[in-house]
Structures are given as C-alpha cells and as structure tokens.
C-alpha cells in the first residue's frame, strides 16, 4: 500500500470510528456490532504502526491507552472549581429560592435542575476544537493532569465539531454494570474490591498506566462551561445545548423550572427513579439559569449564591448488631465499633459502623444482639442511628467497656474533661503501629509508598517497632514481604532515604506529640531552629511563644522528659536524619531576593501548615503587600481550604491563584 493510500485509509477509519464512538457513548444508539468496531480499530492501529508519520494525538487509537506515567503533574485551574452549598429538605430549597429572589429583586427567576452524578469532577481544555488537557478538581485550585487517562473515555470527544477554544467541566463515572463486572473480576483474582462506583471511577482515573483506565469502561457527563472564547451564551441551559452540539455527552434528564414547586417536584421524581438509573446519583443540582443573574447574585465566602446541591436523604436500613470491637489509636484513645450482619447501604455492603465512645452506647442503650438502624453519614461513614426496641427478645447483652486495653492489657484511664477511655502505656503495640502510620503520612515525613498496609506488614514481621527502625530497613527485608519486587523495594528504600532531608517541622509533627499539630510544629521549628534547642526549652519559654498555650507547652516538656524519647533522637542522629529547620525565618527575609517583592497578595481560606497571620508577616518581610480584597491591582491570591468569594473575584480580574503547597514552595526557595 502506497503512503498516499495509507494516509487516506487512516483518515477514513478515524472518521468512521469517531462516528461509531459518538453514536454508542454519547447518543446511546450504536449502529455497528462490537466485532465490526474492533475490526476497524485493529486495522487503524496496524496502519498507524506501519506509518508513524501519520500518527495524531486525537486519533481514536489513543483510547486504548499509551505509555505508563511516572507521576501526575500538578495543574492550576484557570478558574477555580468551587463547591456548592447543600440543601437537605424542602425547607432548605425554599430558603434558597427566597434568597435568590431577594438578591435579584425578580419574581420571574427560572431554574435549571440536573442530576448530581456521583463520580469524579474533572476539567477539560480544548484549543481550536482539539482536546489538549484534562485535570482532576483536586482542592479546587490545583488538580492533577490526567489527560492520557481521560483520552481512554470514549464519551469525551478528542476533537469537537467546531474549532472552538474552551474549558468544560464534567463528572467522570463508572456505570453500575461495569462496576459489578469489575468487582467480580477482582474477586476472582483475589484482589480487594471497590466499595462503590465512585471509588472505582476515581481509582481508575488515577491509574498511572492508561491501559488500565482504558479497560475500566468509564463514561462522562459534561455539566458546564467554565469559559469559551469569542462566544457569549446567555443561559446555562443554552450552554448545555451548545456542548451537546459540539459532541459532548450531556445528561438528558435536565429540566428548566419556573417555580420552586416545580423544582421540588423534580427532586421527588428523581428520588423515586434513582434506583433505575445505570449510574449513581447522590442528589440534584439546582442553578439559576440566566448567566447575567448568576453574575448579579455572585458568591458567598464558600459557594455561589445562584446554585445549590440537594442531597438525597441518607438511606437507612435495619440490621442486627452482632458484636462490638475495640480499636486503639496512636494517642491511646479506645474507640468502639459495631460489628453488623452485612447489609447494603447507599450502594455498598456495610459490616461495621462507628459507635464513637462509651457514652453514646449508653445514651442509645445499644446492646449486642439488637436490631439497629444504620445509615451513612454524608453517604460515606456508616453509623448506628438508633435501636429498634420493639424487636428485643430479652436475650440481648448489655455492653460494658473493658477496664484494660485490648491490645496490651494495661489499665485504661479517663483523663479529666475527656469522654474517651485511653491507654497510657507507651509500649502498647496498637499505639505504636498507629504512630508509625502517622509518622510516614503526607504532612509528616511524607514517605511515598509507605502507607498503612506496608506499615502493618513491617510491624507484623517484627522489622519495625520505633520510628528510627524505618531507617534501618534493608531491601532484603522488603523483598520478604508480600507484593514487593526488586523495583518497589528499591523505590521504597530510596523514599525513606530521601525523607532524612526533611525540615525539622515535619519530624516534629511526625513524632505525634499530644496537642502539637502541623502548624505548631512549624512554629516550634522556626523558633528554636534545632531539635536540641527545643528539647532544652522550659514550659515558660514555650508559653512565651505566640499562640502556644499551657496545655501544649506542658505536653512538649513531658514528651522530651523521657529517656526513651532521648534515645530515639540519638538514633535519628546516627542514621543521618536532619533535625534542623530548613525554612526561612522572618528575620532573615529582609535580605532575600523574592518573588513577593513589590507584589500585592490576598490570603483567603484556611492555611493548614502556616496560619494567615504568619504568612502575612513573611510576605511583608519579603517586600510584598497583603490586602484583604481582590482588585485589578492584585498580583496573587493564595487560597487555603474553604476559600470562597475571593476566588471568584480572582477569576473576574484574571489574577493568578496558588494553593498552600505552591505558596510554601516559593516561600522556601
């Protein structure tokens, strides 16, 4: 076959396969058999392999998955992916309607209602009609680049029907039938199953190997336009129509409503129809349809005033409580958990539910053998709502919390002003294991590849008992563990080695000193600069530090007044673990050339590692100016958790937005 004929045939096959994909995955109206589709796809793959010069990034063949990725790159959203406020009953919906009408002084507002798909929110970027990048929502400001995995979802067009530049937002999901099939395969292979379709979709999208994502049969509904160049669309409903015309899959069950009564009727209708859909929904999204009215209403500190998410009531089911199991956390708190006869709740099989503490068991008079009502708080965490007393037979057993720790048999105590029982034995194996899990966690030593499962394996093999033991691990020991090969063992040893270079605040937080969180650990590290200086500090010296109270100061002094702790610190030194502060002190910032010099910065939301007051001081010390509102003169917005209206203002004025992680990276350069 000549090159000219091959090129023509490749183009014919691409057009044909794109049409087949659109008919099947967007219109739900397939025109050919699977066998015919596969024959055409294999012919295309073969021709492209023989003629690589004709390969295209938007060829249908990329949907089978490509090269394995090393890591997901971070992506800062051009416009933040904000969350919505919630409504839980009819009264909440009527309150929303009242607020909207008061805000726009218009009794003729029209709403658009859409099914709230229970999946993974993503953004899709197109330039001149070609799909160039897709990203997860992340924290709303920064997500992860998952372009290659999204290309495997056939409901996402790789090329639009117009050469338009835009950003669309949507929800990637796994159909129920695909979820059932996937879990059956995992069970047959002896693998852990996914709890629900949402987790399955998220887990598939975040696979580093796109070929795995390609096999998972994901789909996607696009629910909105974040922006589009050279086009003004007056309403949300018209933007959805426009997206459909471009080739996107939009949900056909949307409806415009002229009154709140029509909205409520729509909610009630889909609450009944919900089980019959082939995908999970967890509520209804209600939006003011008119875009000009949306802009007039604006946003609150947390969410848009012009939209709300109605959450379906948590599904409640009845099952029997067969026992109560106890777990011991890293601080020694003993928590009771109900063991249940397996029951399906909100799409997953539930076998355990939280009981929180002894007082709750007494308050609800929960006994072993009781029939209880179980629901998922927020459709996520199973909990016991109440006992069905009419079903009692008299054979149920009252439960009494033990007097001794279930893990080490030490006597349990209830500290002053605390509800929980606590084990105070420092050598309790359960506390040690949970402490190790905390030590390697993201905000502490951040050792990649060392999570709860691996820590448990290492602990059970008696390879680790203290934090310092982690730094004595060998590749040979790891190779003795299940699921470890040469590459994974080498990578983990390297990750542990890399953690030795962490700044002091990470080590301090990882030690798990009572009352000392990530922010306080950073405060101590910056103030004392070395572990040795902190160890020598008195309670009075600690209390003299801004925002350090008496309880925390006492806790720190008590922690370091322990020979075992001092021995641990000595071992860290011998293994080469850094115990000095590597960040920048405010006093040192005056002479530093910085990005922030001459910049106007706005801080919004909750900053986890560094408080806003401390961040303000450091920016100002670097020559920057911190203001309370966003304007055209603002250079940067630093957004923490629960950032709200200032993000919308940043988008309006085209101001760059950073999350806390990006801010700290720049600050510590």
Curated annotation (Swiss-Prot):
Q: Which SUPFAM superfamilies match?
A: BRCT domain, DNA ligase/mRNA capping enzyme, catalytic domain, Nucleic acid-binding proteins, RuvA domain 2-like
Name it: DNA ligase
The EC number(s) given in the record are 6.5.1.2
Annotated signal peptide: none
| Pfam families in UniProt | BRCT, DNA_ligase_aden, DNA_ligase_OB, DNA_ligase_ZBD, HHH_2, HHH_5, Nlig-Ia
Can you supply a Gene Ontology BP term from the record? DNA replication
Which molecular function GO terms apply here?
DNA binding; DNA ligase (NAD+) activity; metal ion binding
Alphabetical keyword list = DNA damage, DNA repair, DNA replication, Ligase, Magnesium, Manganese, Metal-binding, NAD, Zinc
Residue span(s) of domain BRCT: 591-669
> Gene encoding this chain?
ligA
């Amino acid at each position: 076959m000549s090159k000219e004929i091959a090129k023509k045939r490749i183009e014919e096959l691409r057009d044909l396969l794109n049409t087949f994909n659109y008919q099947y995955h967007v219109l739900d109206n397939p025109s050919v058999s699977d066998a015919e589709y596969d024959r055409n796809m294999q012919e295309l793959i073969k021709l492209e392999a023989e003629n690589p010069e004709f390969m295209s990034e938007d060829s249908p063949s990329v949907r089978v998955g490509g090269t394995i990725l090393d890591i997901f790159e971070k992506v800062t959203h051009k416009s933040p992916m904000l969350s919505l406020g919630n409504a839980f009953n009819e009264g909440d919906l009527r309150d929303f309607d009242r607020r909207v009408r008061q805000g726009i002084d218009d009794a003729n507002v029209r709403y658009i209602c859409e099914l709230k798909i229970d999946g993974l929110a993503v953004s899709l970027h197109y330039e001149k009609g070609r799909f160039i990048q897709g990203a997860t929502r992340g924290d709303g400001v920064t997500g992860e680049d998952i372009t290659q995995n999204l290309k495997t979802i056939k409901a996402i067009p790789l090329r639009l029907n117009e050469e338009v530049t835009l950003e669309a937002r949507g929800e990637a999901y796994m159909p129920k039938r695909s979820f059932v099939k996937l879990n059956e395969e995992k069970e047959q292979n002896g693998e852990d199953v996914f709890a629900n379709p949402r987790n399955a979709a998220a887990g598939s999208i975040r696979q580093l190997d796109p070929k795995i994502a390609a096999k998972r049969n994901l789909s996607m509904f696009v629910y909105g336009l974040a922006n589009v160049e050279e086009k003004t669309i007056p309403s949300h409903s018209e933007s959805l129509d426009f997206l459909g015309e471009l080739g996107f899959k939009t949900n056909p069950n949307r409806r415009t409503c002229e009154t709140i009564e029509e909205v409520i009727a729509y909610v009630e209708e889909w609450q009944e129809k919900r089980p019959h859909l082939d995908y999970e929904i967890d509520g209804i999204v209600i939006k003011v349809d008119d875009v000009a009215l949306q802009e007039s209403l604006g946003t609150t500190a947390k969410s848009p005033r012009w939209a709300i998410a109605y959450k379906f009531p948590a599904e409640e089911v009845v099952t029997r409580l067969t026992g109560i199991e106890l777990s011991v956390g890293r601080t020694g708190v003993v928590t009771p958990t109900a063991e249940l006869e397996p029951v399906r709740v909100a799409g997953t099989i539930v076998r355990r539910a939280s009981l929180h503490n002894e007082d709750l068991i007494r308050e609800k008079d929960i006994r072993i053998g009781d029939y209880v009502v179980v629901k998922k708080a927020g459709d996520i965490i199973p909990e016991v709502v109440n006992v069905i007393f009419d079903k009692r037979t008299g054979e149920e057993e009252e439960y009494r919390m033990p007097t001794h720790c279930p893990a080490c048999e030490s006597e349990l105590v209830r500290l002053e002003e605390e509800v929980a029982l606590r084990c105070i034995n420092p050598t309790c194996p359960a506390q040690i294991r949970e402490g190790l899990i905390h030590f390697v966690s993201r905000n502490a030593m951040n050792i990649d590849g060392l999570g709860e499962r691996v820590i448990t394996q290492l602990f059970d093999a008696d390879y680790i008992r203290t934090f310092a033991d982690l730094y004595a691990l060998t590749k040979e020991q790891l190779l003795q563990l299940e699921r470890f090969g040469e590459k994974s063992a080498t990578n983990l040893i390297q990750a542990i080695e890399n953690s030795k270079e962490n700044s002091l605040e990470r080590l301090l937080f990882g030690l798990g000193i009572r009352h000392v969180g990530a922010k306080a650990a950073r405060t101590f590290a910056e103030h004392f600069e070395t572990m040795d200086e902190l160890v020598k500090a008195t309670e009075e010296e600690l209390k003299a530090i801004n925002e350090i109270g008496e309880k925390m100061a006492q806790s720190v002094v008590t922690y370091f007044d322990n020979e075992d702790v001092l021995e641990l610190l000595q071992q860290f030194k011998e293994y080469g673990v850094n115990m000095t502060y590597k960040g920048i002190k405010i006093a040192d910032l005056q002479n530093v050339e910085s990005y922030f010099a001459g910049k106007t910065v706005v801080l919004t939301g909750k900053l986890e590692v560094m408080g806003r007051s401390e961040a303000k001081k450091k920016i100002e010390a670097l020559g920057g100016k911190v203001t309370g509102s966003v304007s055209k003169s603002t250079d940067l917005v630093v957004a923490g958790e629960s950032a709200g209206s200032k993000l919308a203002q940043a988008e309006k004025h085209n101001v760059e937005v950073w999350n806390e992680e990006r801010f700290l990276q720049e600050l510590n350069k």
